[in-house]
Amino acid sequence: LAQSTRHPGQPLRVLIVADTFPPDINGASRFTERLAGGLVRNGNNVHIIAPATSKAWGTFTEIQDGVEMTVHRIRSYPLVIHKTLRFVNPLTLKNKVDLILDEFEPDAIHSQSHLSVGRVLARSGRERGIRLIATNHTMPENLLKYLHLPKFLEKRVKAKLWKDAGKVLSKYDQITTPTRRAAELLEAAAGIENVLAISCGIDATKFTNSTKTTNNPFRVLFLGRLDWEKHVHNLLKAAAKLPKEIDFFIEIAGDGSQKKYLADLARELKISTRVKFLGHISEEELPLAYERATVFAMPSIAELQSIATMEAMASGRPVIAANAMALPHLVHHGDNGYLFEPDDVDDFSACLLKVATADQKELNRLSENSIHLIQSHDIKRTLSIFEGLYRGDQDARQNSDDNSEDYMKPIGRLSIVVRRAELKVRRQALAALGKITDLGDEIKDGLEEIGQDVKRQAKKVDKQVRTGVKKTVGKAKKAIKRLDE
């Protein structure tokens, strides 16, 4: 990356480009909003280019993430195949983008998607010598379901979509993605190199609470888009398999194409009275939803990180998640929750049961480990890395702390060596206890024998005493009689 003309500490001019932005509610949208908000709070000048979600398009001053920022809303049209994706006319897009670039003159462009607006910005930004950063939040697998392609075409189309992603992203100076697992996938599937793993980050203080995790009642929360790849239907099926004595409730926050299907499924499974669909919830309601929950569930099979899961962890809640994509990066099996095999409803249900029947000590342990793990995802660190990339600082080209080797080490479970040693000590203790028990029986028998001897001796002494007393009394009487005479 070229060195910036602005010195460290000087405000940056950053243009963030996104295909999804609030009021859209999804992980990419929320990250973009919080990234922009954090940059503004750090004193930088931030503009956003994003599709308009209504008939009002143009340039607006909007309050996002609690701060003012300039948002350029591009005229767009809803896609029939997907509830949240929107189509922007590529024939008119470049002219609009070029006008914004010439007027704003950004130090860096940070694209959050290569599909639409980010595709055009790559070309326009390169023409002007602007530093280009791209963060990938997209998996082609998530799009295939909505194309309704024949099975035999899916593999071929998926390969073409990945190739297209590589073609667009390779025009950027630096590519990032939220986790090391997602970076490895992007490098292998799209044919690009040196992808940085930088966590989306989170301001954990927004979700801190003093409420202990409790499973009485047992409350499960899911928050996210209600679309196919989230596999929320597996949550309902797994909950329906819980023993009848488990008094469970499920709260589902979010909206999407699967909402009606999920409501129908809950009725079919005869658990509709235990399932509540919250719809979209406000930023003020969000921490309260996590605080109410016993456990957060994320059954999705296509998460490149999952901001909702990080929010649950920051709230001190255990997490049960599918053992797929980047979720094992957040959920350390047995430490702060449990992983189940994707689409294995029985395994999912067994994980739910573990938390539902855990004692308070175990719930506290899981909760504390969630809080411990989320500390590596501090958004201040994320902002610092990106600001360095915007300036062209070579030292900024590094992964975030959660992608270090130490982060993945177990924290709540013992290593195999230590566990074996502990088992050996337990066995020795049990053996010693057995010997003590045997010895105790011998002592008991001995004491009983002593007790019987004591009783016999006591009777003998009593007899002797009584006889002695009688003799003494008799002698005393004779002595008194002699005195009287």
Sequence positions of predicted segments:
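N-terminal subdomain of nucleotide-sugar transferases
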Residues: 1-73, 411, 415-436, 440-443
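Carbohydrate-associated surface elements
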Residues: 52, 181, 201
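Short alpha-helical donor nucleotide-sugar binding micro-motif in glycosyltransferases
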Residues: 169, 280-281, 288-293
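Conserved donor-binding/catalytic core segment of Leloir-type glycosyltransferases
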Residues: 213-239, 251
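Aromatic "clamp/platform" in nucleotide-sugar-dependent glycosyltransferases that forms part
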Residues: 301
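Short hydrophobic beta-strand element within catalytic cores of glycosyltransferases
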Residues: 318-321
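A short, well-ordered alpha-helix in the C-terminal region of glycosyltransferases
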Residues: 347, 361-376, 388
